[in-house]
Amino acid sequence: FLISIPYSASIGGTATLTGTA
């Protein structure tokens, strides 16, 4: 999960990070 945060943020950006959270 912790790895998925920066990983997704690098691809989708803030939108993905907010969606995952």
Curated annotation (Swiss-Prot):
One Gene Ontology CC term in the entry: extracellular region
Localization per record: Secreted
Chief location category: secreted
Gene Ontology process terms (BP): defense response
Modified residues annotated as Alanine amide in this record: A21
Tissue-specificity statement: Expressed by the parotoid glands.
Keywords, in A-Z order: Amidation, Amphibian defense peptide, Secreted
Record's keyword annotation contains Secreted: yes
Family to which the UniProt record says this protein belongs: Belongs to the frog skin active peptide (FSAP) family. Phylloseptin subfamily.
Official protein name in the record: Phylloseptin Bu-1
Native organism: Phyllomedusa burmeisteri (Brazilian common walking leaf frog)
